[in-house]
């Protein structure tokens, strides 16, 4: 497998919902910040060539790394939304990354990506002309709420999946999809949604429930527990 895949890591968010004094990607867990764990998981894979970390305009917490695990780490300034930040990252990739090459996008605060999940996504996604995302089947019963807070019905879950990251698409196709969504005033919440607007049907690659995003203090506690178990 060629080491030609770059990963865009949007890290421009302030994490206001978390309620911490720092953006959540800079919170400590197991002796290093969450973003470091995320880069560990991504750059350890031999098919990943480097990372473009998209940071905020006034980010005083970025450690200033220019390499990680012996691979280049570049930075650029993001936008007001995740989609704008991902687009900025795609545009800032090195010229050696061709327009038709696949690029990964992965959440900065999703530090528990497994090598198996990443490898499976790359193996499956690069055989598809569009690309693929990691996702998890919905296993809980889903209720539809009415305006009064009462239950209006139960939704069938058989074909429902929760979108995870990484997500894998060709650089030029994803750039166009994100640009078109922005021009139309549509807020896309993940890269696959932008591609869907283009009439594309990315593949779903089942990923582990352990690939969770740290969005609350309870999530951070969960990740610290994972690290303690891993350490023995």
From Swiss-Prot:
The keyword Nucleotidyltransferase applies. One of its GO terms (molecular function) is 2-C-methyl-D-erythritol 4-phosphate cytidylyltransferase activity. Pfam families: IspD. SUPFAM superfamilies: Nucleotide-diphospho-sugar transferases. InterPro entries: IspD, IspD/TarI, IspD/TarI_cytidylyltransf_bact, ISPD_synthase_CS, Nucleotide-diphossugar_trans. The record marks 157, 213 as: Positions MEP for the nucleophilic attack. Keywords: Isoprene biosynthesis, Nucleotidyltransferase, Transferase. The record marks 17, 24 as: Transition state stabilizer. It comes from the Bacteria. One of its GO terms (biological process) is isopentenyl diphosphate biosynthetic process, methylerythritol 4-phosphate pathway. Its EC number is 2.7.7.60. It catalyses: 2-C-methyl-D-erythritol 4-phosphate + CTP + H(+) = 4-CDP-2-C-methyl-D-erythritol + diphosphate. Pathway: Isoprenoid biosynthesis; isopentenyl diphosphate biosynthesis via DXP pathway; isopentenyl diphosphate from 1-deoxy-D-xylulose 5-phosphate: step 2/6. Coiled coil: none annotated. The keyword Nucleotidyltransferase applies. Catalyzes the formation of 4-diphosphocytidyl-2-C-methyl-D-erythritol from CTP and 2-C-methyl-D-erythritol 4-phosphate (MEP). NCBIfam families: ispD. Belongs to the IspD/TarI cytidylyltransferase family. IspD subfamily. This is 2-C-methyl-D-erythritol 4-phosphate cytidylyltransferase. The gene is ispD.
């Amino acid at each position: 497998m060629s080491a030609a895949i770059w990963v865009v890591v949007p890290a421009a968010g302030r994490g206001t919902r978390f309620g911490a004094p720092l953006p959540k990607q800079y919170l400590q867990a197991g002796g290093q910040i969450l973003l470091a764990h995320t880069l560990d998981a991504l750059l350890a894979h031999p098919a990943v060539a480097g990372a473009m970390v998209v940071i905020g305009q006034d980010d005083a917490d970025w450690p200033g790394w220019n390499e990680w695990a012996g691979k280049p780490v570049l930075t650029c300034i993001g936008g007001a939304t995740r989609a704008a930040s991902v687009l900025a990252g795609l545009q800032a990739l090195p010229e050696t990354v061709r327009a038709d090459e696949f690029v990964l996008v992965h959440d900065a605060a999703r530090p528990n990506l497994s090598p198996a999940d990443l490898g499976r996504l790359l193996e499956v996604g690069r055989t598809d002309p569009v690309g693929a995302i990691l996702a998890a089947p919905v296993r809980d019963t889903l209720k539809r709420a009415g305006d009064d807070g009462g239950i209006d019905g139960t939704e069938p879950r058989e074909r429902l999946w929760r979108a995870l990251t990484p997500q894998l698409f060709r650089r030029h196709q994803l750039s166009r999809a994100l640009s078109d969504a922005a021009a139309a005033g549509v807020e896309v919440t993940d890269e696959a949604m932008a591609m869907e607007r283009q009439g594309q049907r990315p593949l779903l690659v089942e990923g582990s429930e352990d690939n969770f995003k740290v969005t609350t203090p309870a999530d951070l506690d969960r990740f610290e527990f994972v690290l303690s178990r891993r350490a023995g």
